[in-house]
Amino acid sequence: MSKLPVLISIPHGGSQIPPEISGRVCITPKDQFEDGDALTQDIYGVKNEVLAFVEGNIARAFVDLNRDVNDRPPKNPDGVVKSMTCLGKPIYQSGHELDENLTEMLLQKYYHPYHGLIREILDSNSEVQLMLDCH
């Protein structure tokens, strides 16, 4: 059976805490779970049936792969790199919030490669007819 001409993107299904910030975090696993799109990998478990499948492994509470790269704290505490969860809970211990260097490192290591992979797939695979951003 041929694969469907679809690219599936799952930006909010990850659960990992970036190791670079693990000692700064104060939210609980429950907070982290509530801030993401739980079970999206299971709901959209069609990896073997589509031409391309891209999923984030970092939890949305830390790097939101579905935001504009310039949507950042303090203007938006629930932006691309967060200072608060979507429910308004501080993510980092007081005095251990992200600085500009750490923010840029997280974007370079997690955000840009995710979007680069999507762009590469779309640019190099003319068979992909539809991209679905799944939540």
Give the ranges of each region predicted by the language model.
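N-terminal catalytic or cofactor-binding beta/alpha core of small enzyme domains
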Residues: 1-131
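Acidic/histidine-rich, metal-coordinating catalytic segments
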Residues: 133-135
